[in-house]
Structures are given as structure tokens and as C-alpha cells.
Regions:
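Ordered, amphipathic secondary-structure segments that act as subunit-interaction surfaces
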Residues: 87-100
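Helix-start/capping segments and mature chain N-termini
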Residues: 1-83, 87, 106, 110-291
Length: 291
């Protein structure tokens, strides 16, 4: 799916037209040299930010974890993001990418305390991937080689990139990551299994990203009276599961139909997955008419 970037972006508090101006960052910007920063991605439906409060809560928590002091309040950032959306006259479905880095200084692992952070946001058109949600994806299994603070939405994504490109060359769309015998999540998504009508997912600790869509799906499951367990589970439990799926902000809920060379379960999305997708769809429809 080809992404289409919109012209107007947010850059350090300004709304800038990239056709007229190309914002620049310093050569010794720590985000550029060290990956010293945080990012966030949130969804837009019909031009309206979805679950923005939850995304920004995580954004600020991640900044707090790395002791990066934001040059804005949450309210100021919300206003700037809305200005960017309005300036683009964006009324479609899409994603907003938001990033902040610590700032520029002479290269040193020890950062200065009074740096001026660099931040920006941009919009990308991205229709809902309905076909993927219906047909499902082929996945494989990989060792989780990431660091031990995966709950921080850091710019440092090199392990994810290495795994994602490896499996892409093999024809897979996502990987089930395993750390010391425990299934954690995917390269860019959270992971769930279903067994005996029970939803099971790794607990929200330091070994996974505390996904907003993950949180939302758990909420929907409880509203549907589907039992949810947040616990560690093994790869063997995955193979023996009735259903499994990934969740991510841009992709919502996408079922697994094949693991490695073998068909998984029925080879189609299961009834619990369908039920959760329907509930998610209904919630989006309600969001569109009430916001």
C-alpha cells in the first residue's frame, strides 16, 4: 500500500508547507546521531484523531522514562496537531507520525540538561486495510533480539528493522517474537491467541510495547464478555491455539492464517477475531458520527 504524505507538517511549533520550505535539523541532533528520542503514531478517521488522549499519554510517559522534557504541554501539542490537520484540509483516513528528539550538541553519550528538543509531525493518507483484516496474513517465528525496555516507544528500531526485512524477503508479513521461550509480540504489533473462547496476550511489562490498539481490543473483549488473560505463554500454546491475531494502530486487528509453511488452525480468521473486528468497526463508525 503506497503512502501519500501531505504537504503541511508541524515542525517545532510551526505549521510548514514542505513544497515551499524543507525544515532542517542540526547535524549533531541527538535523534539523528543516537536515536535519542520518542515517536508516536495515531490514526485519523475522516480527518478526526482517534484515541488521541491515550496516544499522547503514552508519548509523554515515554518522554518521562528517558528524562526528555517536552517544550510544550499536552494541550499545546493537541492544538498544534489540530492546526496541521486543518491546514491540510484532511478529511480522509490516515496516520499521523509524531516524533521528538532531545536536541543538538557536540557528540557525547552524556546529554546536556538544557537542550532544545526538536519535534515534528506529518500526515500520511492510509485507508483501512480491509482486505488484510479479512483474508489474514502469513507469519513466521523469530527470536526477540530487542532491548529490555520495549515499553518505551523509542526511535531505536534497528532490531525491528532487521527482523522485518529478513522475514519480508522470505515472504512473511509479520513475525511472532520469542524471548527465552516466551512469546512477546510482533515486529510492529501486539499479539493475541484465542483458546477455548479465551483471549490471551503477554502482560504489559517492559518486554512489549503497551499498544493502544491492544488496550482498546482488551476493553472491547471485556464488553463482549470474552474472558481475557494477560500472562506469559509459549510458542507451543500458539500452535495449539484456536485463533491468533496481531493488533496495531494502522492495521487494527489482523488475523494469522499461516505460520511458517503450515496452515494455522482453519486457515481463516476465527469467530472471536471476527467478533472483535466487528466491535472495532462499530466503534469507529460511532466515533465518526460523534466527533
Amino acid at each position: 500500500m503506497k503512502a501519500t504524505h501531505k504537504d503541511w507538517i508541524l515542525f517545532n511549533g510551526r505549521i510548514v508547507n514542505t513544497k515551499e520550505e524543507q525544515p532542517m535539523v542540526a547535524l549533531e541532533e541527538r535523534g539523528f546521531q543516537f536515536g535519542d528520542g520518542i515517536y508516536e503514531v495515531f490514526r485519523i478517521y475522516d480527518g478526526k484523531p482517534h484515541l488521541l488522549d491515550l496516544h499522547l499519554e503514552r508519548f509523554f510517559k515515554s518522554m518521562e522514562e528517558i528524562k526528555l522534557i517536552a517544550p510544550f504541554t499536552k494541550e499545546e501539542l493537541v492544538e498544534e496537531l489540530h492546526q496541521m490537520i486543518e491546514k491540510n484540509q484532511f478529511q480522509e483516513d490516515g496516520n499521523v507520525y509524531l516524533q521528538i528528539s532531545r536536541g543538538a550538541q557536540a557528540r557525547n553519550h552524556v546529554y546536556e540538561k538544557d537542550l532544545q528538543p526538536t519535534y515534528f509531525a506529518n500526515i500520511v493518507s492510509f485507508p483501512r486495510p480491509v482486505a488484510t483484516m479479512e483474508v489474514g496474513i502469513k507469519v513466521t517465528v523469530e527470536e526477540d533480539i530487542r532491548w529490555k525496555f520495549c515499553h518505551i516507544k523509542s526511535l531505536n528500531l534497528l532490531p525491528n528493522i532487521m527482523i522485518k526485512n529478513k522475514i519480508n524477503e522470505q515472504g512473511y508479513q509479520e513475525a511472532i517474537l520469542v524471548r527465552d521461550g516466551v512469546v512477546t509480540e510482533g515486529c510492529h504489533s501486539n499479539f493475541f491467541i484465542v483458546k477455548n473462547d479465551k483471549l490471551i496476550t503477554h502482560p504489559a511489562d517492559h518486554f512489549i510495547l503497551h499498544g493502544i490498539t491492544r488496550h482498546y481490543v482488551i476493553t472491547l473483549a471485556k464488553e463482549l464478555h470474552i474472558k481475557v488473560e494477560e500472562r506469559e505463554f509459549s510458542l507451543q500454546e500458539v500452535y495449539e491455539a484456536d485463533e491468533c491475531f496481531f493488533t496495531a494502530t494502522p492495521l487494527e486487528i489482523f488475523p494469522v492464517v499461516q505460520i511458517g509453511d503450515e496452515q494455522f488452525a482453519s486457515g481463516e480468521r476465527g469467530p472471536i477475531t471476527k467478533k472483535l473486528q466487528s466491535a472495532y468497526e462499530e466503534s469507529i463508525s460511532l466515533f465518526k458520527v460523534t466527533n
